[in-house]
C-alpha cells in the first residue's frame, strides 16, 4: 500500500466542499490514514512550498495557502500517488477532465481546490511535514 498527501485548499474549505471531496477519495477506494484541519502560518506555507521559492508564483501561492484553513490528509491505497493525481485532475481546472476534483471545484490554475504529492519520495517528505507517526493509522498488513 502506498501513501500520499492530499490538501484540501482554502477555497474548497471556505465553500464547504470538504465532505464532498473526502467522499470522492473514499468512493475511489482510498482509505484515510490521517486527517486534520490547520491554518498555515507564512513560515509553514513557505516551508512546505520551499521547492517553488524561485518561481514567479511563489508569493501568490503562499498568500493563498494562508488565506484560510486547509484540510491535510494521508490517503492510502494501491498506486496512491498516481491515482490521487488522476482523481484531482490537471493543475488548471479548465484543462482538467470532467468529473475530476479540480474540474468540479477549482476556479483557476492558482485556486484549484486540492494539492497532491507528485511522487512517492515527495509524498513521504510532505506527510512528515504535517504528521507524526503516531497520527497516521496504517492499514493492517
UniProtKB/Swiss-Prot annotation:
PROSITE patterns: NDPK, NDPK_LIKE. It catalyses: a 2'-deoxyribonucleoside 5'-diphosphate + ATP = a 2'-deoxyribonucleoside 5'-triphosphate + ADP; a ribonucleoside 5'-diphosphate + ATP = a ribonucleoside 5'-triphosphate + ADP. The gene is ndk. Disulfide bonds: none annotated. Its EC number is 2.7.4.6. One of its GO terms (biological process) is CTP biosynthetic process. Homotetramer. Pfam families: NDK (PF00334). GO terms for molecular function: ATP binding; metal ion binding; nucleoside diphosphate kinase activity. Major role in the synthesis of nucleoside triphosphates other than ATP. The ATP gamma phosphate is transferred to the NDP beta phosphate via a ping-pong mechanism, using a phosphorylated active-site intermediate. ATP binds at residues 9, 57, 85, 91, 102, 112. GO terms for cellular component: cytoplasm. It comes from Chlamydia caviae (strain ATCC VR-813 / DSM 19441 / 03DC25 / GPIC) (Chlamydophila caviae). Keywords: ATP-binding, Cytoplasm, Kinase, Magnesium, Metal-binding, Nucleotide metabolism, Nucleotide-binding, Phosphoprotein, Transferase. The active site is at 115 (pros-phosphohistidine intermediate). Its main location: cytoplasm. The keyword Phosphoprotein applies. SMART domains: NDK (SM00562). This is Nucleoside diphosphate kinase. Belongs to the NDK family. Its cofactor is Mg(2+). It is found in: Cytoplasm.
